[in-house]
């Protein structure tokens, strides 16, 4: 999955590009409002726990992703 139609890359000083608003690429996953819905499915089979959205990976452009400190990882990506 590419954020902002592929317009999110690494800008100057190894910080994330402005195409996606820096670290705010996923407004619903901001640090101050991060929530997880937990669903327990219990039946005759062994109990398993599933977390909503757990299958979502980290968006990356050309092998580069926005790190937790709003810096590109790795810093050499363009």
Curated annotation (Swiss-Prot):
Keywords, sorted A to Z: Metal-binding, Metal-thiolate cluster
**Does Metal-binding count among this protein's keywords?**
yes
Molecular function terms in GO for this entry? metal ion binding
Pfam families listed in its UniProt record: Metallothio_2
**What are the annotated disulfide bridges?**
none
- Per its UniProt entry, which superkingdom is the organism in? Eukaryota
- Please explain the role this protein plays, according to its UniProt record: Metallothioneins have a high content of cysteine residues that bind various heavy metals.
Which family does the similarity line name? Belongs to the metallothionein superfamily. Type 15 family.
Q: What is this protein called?
A: Metallothionein-like protein type 2
According to its UniProt entry, this protein's organism is Actinidia deliciosa (Kiwi)
